Swiss-Prot record:
This is BOS complex subunit NCLN. GO terms for cellular component: endoplasmic reticulum membrane; multi-pass translocon complex. It is found in: Endoplasmic reticulum membrane. Glycans are attached at residues 241, 428.
Length: 563
């Protein structure tokens, strides 16, 4: 029998039996010569940043889920249920996002360009409008953001092509494509998100004590340092509120020099406060006021506060607006400051449009509009200076608020306006006859654009979401060190949410590693099993009826020789 099998195999290799040779050897040949799938194509690992998840005043916001293990599709696909929907920022719209949620998608991954500064302005404005709407609704669908790279872009394009072909092909083509196409399984490495217990929101206070008696008037300068956006790890907050903190630090530097010399040491206390939790209903300011007004007898806030100046989003545009809850009365120091701002802007910077915006405090709202409202509730005269017309403006809470959105010259100009107006109030220069077009800060005492630039670069070199800034982290220690160079009695204040009725709750798993594995669909395994079964059946039949096969081959060979 073995000799007969050898003879058959020898005959099979002859040209006349080439089709039969294909049948016998083709599967083995294909397995041997098929190139292996490159490792880079088989799997890709990349970092993803989860959408906000927090509770504020007992109200949940953002996504409530972090675990992802499902197949990728683009929004063009007809069926998105239990699929990971990939969207590029340039093609993103709120309607597409809603479509994914309505169809019970397993997850949404939004792919961001590497250079955010190069994103077209119409796309930036549209996404800034969408971000608050995304956060306003609670969703159980995990929502992630990823920064585009070549491999991730290739995954998106392949997935998009597969999704598009399913929508436009015939039923047979769809079935064939479904059985043979490559897919991508998206898997996150982290666990389900959990509430972070005992998280501290930190604020930093410093002061310059005025020259004279104990009962000197106090001017308070406030800016919150934290940033906010739809994804905490992408929240750089360049304009809101990196610009405000930059101005506060520059004012601290300038007035510390003035307060160094007795001749220019004013009879005003200057209290500087870099507040934390500004994007979460100004939690740092709220606790600071409670501690200063209700639980201590030695605070500068208790006696003779002239006014509180809050700085929020002052890094671009040709407008400056003073937002007030109650218009200042004539004869008060806050009214004098308002007039000095108008005077300096009109005479020294005529290209700047200055105005006052009056908005009453709405205590029915879950979140206060501006930081000065925290002080106004405690009957302290306060206002917020900003280039924004409304507290609902998109740049105040967007991941699109990157370094390129802050114009250095504009920020320097606005710093000069604020410094000049404050100085004219503190030293009563207008009453002393100083011309309105004469700048106070010149030569060695001028506002330094290089200093402001370096501070802005430092602030926007890291995300500053409140959930990410630990009290012992480098950011807060650097901020405290910077203030200590110019101010006295610099110290930290901490806020911790109440365990029984917390005003705010943060959650973890905000940054994870996601893996995209190239996979075949389940129907491909079924098709492959059918093909293998058919091949094995043919082989089994050939072995069982080997004598028939042998006689058939012999007959074919004899016929060929006879011809």
């Amino acid at each position: 029998m073995l000799e007969e099998a050898g003879e058959v195999l020898e005959n099979v290799l002859k040209a006349s039996c080439l089709p039969l040779g294909f049948i016998v050897f083709l599967p083995a040949v294909l397995l041997l010569v098929a190139p292996p799938l490159p490792a880079a194509d088989a799997a890709h690992e990349f970092t993803v940043y989860r959408m906000q998840q927090y509770d504020l005043q007992g109200q949940p916001y953002g996504t409530r889920n972090a675990v992802l293990n499902t197949e990728a599709r683009t929004v063009d696909a007809d069926v998105l249920s239990r699929r990971c929907v990939l969207m590029r920022l340039l093609d993103f719209s709120y309607e597409h996002y809603q479509k994914a949620l309505r169809q019970s998608a397993g997850a949404v991954v939004i792919i961001l360009p590497r250079a955010m500064a190069a994103v077209p302005q119409d796309v930036v404005r549209q996404f800034m409008e969408i971000e608050p709407e995304m956060l306003a609704m609670e969703t159980v669908v995990p929502v992630y953001f990823a920064v585009e790279d070549e491999a991730l872009l290739s995954i998106y394009e392949q997935t998009q092509a597969a999704s598009a072909s399913q929508g436009s092909a015939s039923a047979a083509e769809v079935l064939l494509h479904t059985a043979t196409a490559n897919g991508f399984q998206m898997v996150t490495s982290g666990a389900q998100s959990q509430a972070v217990s005992d998280w501290l929101i930190t604020s930093v206070e410093g002061r310059l004590t005025g020259l004279g008696g104990e009962d000197l008037p106090t001017i308070v300068i406030v800016a919150h340092y934290d940033a906010f956006g739809v994804a905490p790890w992408l929240s750089l907050g360049a304009d809101s509120n990196g610009s405000g903190i930059s101005v506060l630090l520059e004012l601290a530097r300038l007035f510390s020099r003035l307060y160094t010399y007795k001749r220019t040491h004013a009879a005003y206390n200057l209290l500087f406060f870099a507040s934390g939790g500004g994007k979460f209903n100004y939690q740092g300011t709220k606790r600071w006021l409670e501690d200063s007004l209700d639980h201590t007898d030695s605070s500068l806030l208790q006696d003779n506060v002239a006014f509180v100046l809050c700085l929020d989003t002052v890094g671009r545009g040709s407008h400056l607006r003073l937002h007030v809850s109650k218009p200042p009365r004539e004869g008060t120091l806050q009214h004098a400051f308002l007039r000095e701002l108008e005077t300096v802007a009109a005479h020294q910077f005529p290209d700047v449009s200055f105005s006052m915006v009056h908005k009453k405090i709405n205590l029915a709202d879950d979140v206060l509009a501006w930081e000065h409202e925290r002080f106004a509730i405690r009957r302290l005269p306060a206002f917020t200076l900003s280039h924004l017309e409304s507290h609902r403006a998109g740049p105040r809470s967007s991941i699109m608020d990157v370094r390129s959105r802050v114009d250095s010259k504009t920020l320097t100009r606005n710093t000069r306006i604020i410094a000049e107006a404050l100085t004219r109030v503190i030293y009563n220069l207008t009453e002393k006859g100083t011309p309105p077009d004469m700048p106070v800060f010149t030569e060695q005492m001028q506002v330094q654009e290089e200093q402001i630039d370096s501070v802005m670069d430092w602030l926007t070199n890291q995300p500053r979401a409140a959930q990410l800034l630990d009290k012992d982290g480098t950011f807060l220690s650097t901020l405290e060190h910077f203030l200590s160079r110019y101010l006295k009695d610099v110290r930290q204040h901490h806020v911790k949410a109440d365990k029984r009725d917390p005003e705010f709750v943060f959650y973890d798993q905000l940054k994870q590693v996601m893996n995209a594995y190239r996979v075949k669909p389940a129907i491909f395994d079924l098709l492959l099993a059918l093909c293998i079964g058919a091949y094995l059946g043919m082989a089994y039949t050939a072995v069982q009826h080997f004598h028939v096969l042998y006689k058939t081959v012999q007959r074919l060979l004899l016929k060929a020789k006879a011809q």
